[in-house]
Each structure stands twice: as C-alpha cells, then as structure tokens.
A protein has these predicted regions:
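A cross-family detector of function-defining hotspots
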Residues: 1-26, 44-113
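Acidic/histidine-rich, surface-exposed loop or edge segments in extracytoplasmic proteins
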Residues: 27-37
Length: 113
C-alpha cells in the first residue's frame, strides 16, 4: 500500500510538499506543489473542497466576502521569485467556482509601483 503525506510550511511559509512512500515505507518522491502550474490545473466547477485540501493542504487563510456565497481559501506561493497568493473560491456546496491570483506585498514594503 502506497502512502502520501503532506508537509506544509503555511501559514508563514510558501511551500507544501507531497511525500510519496512505497508499500515498504521507503520515500519514493518529494514534490513541492504550491506552484502556478499546479494552481492553474484546478478545474473550475469540477474540483471540490476535498480536492483542494488533498492537493494543497489547509489554506493559510479562509475568509468570506459579500459578493460570493462561500469561502475563499488563500495560499501563499512563489511564482519564480515573486511572492504571490492564490485565492480559491469554494461555494456552499463545496465546489470550486473561481481562482484569482494576486501579488503578495510583504508587510512594510511601501514601494510605490
């Protein structure tokens, strides 16, 4: 029986690792999954909250906004060398409806862009 463990550096970090073990308990593979490519693979209107949590682990932040009837799960990640955030909108039925990316400006970074 194969097993996958998930190791997360969230909420402060920007990496989540899948650790895949073979039936004898030997580590076969380590993969960092908080990537733009992985987030872009989320199938809107198909993926569920369980799919998101199984792939990326618990989010760093869960929040609600007035114009969406559900939760927004936020993950921090690095896109090349740029700090970013992925905001996954999950409706009340547990289905992913929208994915939005934003820049993650570090606290105290008051540069005028």
């Amino acid at each position: 029986n194969r097993e996958r463990l998930l190791y997360s550096t969230l909420p402060a970090g920007r990496r989540v690792f899948h650790l895949d073990f073979d039936g004898a308990g030997r580590l076969e593979r380590v993969e960092q999954v908080l990537t733009l490519a992985r987030f872009s693979g989320i199938a809107l209107n198909t993926w569920t909250q369980a799919d998101v949590e199984r792939t990326f682990g618990p989010p760093m932040l869960v929040e609600r906004v007035a114009r969406f009837d559900g939760d927004i799960w936020t993950y921090r990640f690095m896109d090349d060398y740029e700090p970013r955030m992925a905001h996954i909108h999950i409706d009340r039925a547990g289905t992913v409806r929208q994915l939005v990316f934003s820049d993650d400006q570090p606290p105290g970074d008051d540069r005028d862009f």
